[in-house]
């Protein structure tokens, strides 16, 4: 079940504040965030985010096709190591 349209997208206040400040200064420095739940909005296009995956920060460059998705979708938290191959 998705979020109600009446509420609008969720974006962490501190994150949107940093993005707007960067837009005013026309700077494109990476923005470090732990807010994986924040939705990507059109004003974030062209910015680079460092999204925490639980262990380290992964770099995510926001493009037009990412709008409407969440930052955490582009920073996987689990690594699958293949099962051992049986010899015989």
Curated annotation (Swiss-Prot):
Please tell me whether the keyword Ribosomal protein is annotated for this protein.
Answer: yes
A GO CC term attached to the entry: small ribosomal subunit
Tell me the keywords, alphabetical order: Ribonucleoprotein, Ribosomal protein, RNA-binding, rRNA-binding
User: Does the keyword field hold Ribonucleoprotein?
Assistant: yes
Its Gene Ontology biological processes? ribosomal small subunit assembly; translation
**Alphabetized SUPFAM superfamilies for the sequence:** Ribosomal protein S19
Q: Which NCBIfam families match?
A: rpsS_bact (TIGR01050)
* PANTHER family hit by this protein: RIBOSOMAL PROTEIN S19P FAMILY MEMBER, SMALL RIBOSOMAL SUBUNIT PROTEIN US19M
Q: What is this protein called?
A: Small ribosomal subunit protein uS19
